[in-house]
Amino acid sequence: TSADYNTTKQITHTPAAETGVCFSPDNRTLAYASERGGNWQLYLAKIARKEEANFPNATIIEEEVLLPSKTVERNYPQFSPDGKELAFIEDRMRLMVVNLETKKVRQVTDGSTWYSTAGGFDYSWSPDGKWFTLRFIGNKHDPYSDIGLVSAQGGEITNLTNSGYTSTSPQWVLDGNAILFTTERYGMRAHASWGSLNDAMLVFMNQDAYDKFRLSKEDYELQKELEKEQKEVAGDKTDDKKKEDTADQKKDEKPKDIVVELKGIQDRILRLTPNSSEMGSAVISKNGETLYYFSAFEDKYDLWKMDLRKKETKLLHKMNTGWANMEMDKEGKNLFLLGSNSMQKMDMGSEKLTPIHYQANLKMDLAAEREYMFDHVYKQEQKRFYNVNMHGVNWDAMTAAYRKFLPHINNNYDFAELLSEYLGELNVSHTGGRFRPQTSGNITANLGLLFDWNHSGKGLLIAEVVEKGPFDHARSKVKAGTVMEKIDGQEITPDMDYSKLLNNKAQKKTLVS
């Protein structure tokens, strides 16, 4: 959808899950993963017509499978900064890269530093495309992860944090001169698998960036003036001709190579937040002056701001959201905020919030969705169950036995019960199915009648009037043995699900005859 208008384009329409969507640098290609056919695969969606500028207004979108396979799982794609390569996670543990022109694949990590089979881990390309920062587990210290650095060509991972506690969510900031991450090393730790309090921290790639960042506001301003004067003396001052660079020239500009100095890097780690808290995501402004972060001090998440030179922190926007994530555009002009019930854009200059609206219709094949979810549960247990023998259960045979009930289920309450009984065959804790209906959806009225399903004639033969239901009153003519033939004048046929005639009829006058 557009960030400025409610124009929205549907990219996929399948019962299977799609996840990990990302834009190419030119914004004309989307990469994502889908579990169609029972296996996570990478897909590319491209704007077909050159004259169409963006996805929300595109009329034709072409989709292709990248590296098709029925056995190898590929997920969580990310385009390289130049758009020529795509990184992804293979079989839930290995970081890989594919050249989009040649389709040649190379291995960056071998999977030995990740143990969870949940699906993937945090990673990010460096701005120059030569490095990855990633979340990994060193010294077999699962599940406590560190932040690592590895060449985009593959090789040994350098542990940047070496902490006994969990560090996560690494991202490149300050033009690639530092990595921002969150850690529980100072806060309440998850000794019992919950309750972590986190801080935002920086690890600097080189001494020069570290020294500049630690300058006071006054010293930093003096440093900028000095550098400006030095450029003027050296004759490097930008003249009018250079200011008139064309858009094409700017487009071809390559990012500077990042200077990585591993020696002494453990001494270039700084804690940014003044106190540990229940944090969401964090972002540093393009100029490196401000830290924005989500934190839940009073029940839910709000947006906080910290001046990194003055060391001043304040509540910027009261969001009151149950979960929160944010991302800055590549120009550093806008911050996009996602919450549990809203999307918003914040202008980085004025720090004003603007809601992002969308207009979209969604059609769902609910039976196909339930079949996909059933298959997803089957595969999750098959790949992730802690006991290779599946507690002695023939999982394929058990799956076939429960699959036969799927065609007879027409609601998610019953589907949740099916999943609970199906998973219960494994005799293990923390499994089962739940369904929480959305109260904002269409409401189907209930007549408070039970029917004789052996009735073969027209309409529905009433077997019982439910006590205290709509027809259980003194003047009601409806009783057991009555045949209900029409609802609001529409005839009930033998092959019809009559409940659709009651859609959105709750608390409304309805004629039953």
Protein language model annotation of sequence segments:
Residues 20-29, 76-85, 123-132, 170-178, ...:
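Blade-terminus and WD-like Trp-Asp/Gly-His loop motifs, strongest in beta-propeller folds
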Residues 190, 349-352, 356-421, 425-426, ...:
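Terminal targeting/pro-maturation regions of precursor/exported proteins
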Residues 473-496, 501, 512:
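Conserved PDZ fold ligand-binding element
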Residues 4-10, 59-66, 258-276:
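A short helix->beta-strand "capping" segment at the edge of beta-propeller domains
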Residues 426-468, 472:
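PDZ/PDZ-like peptide-tail recognition elements
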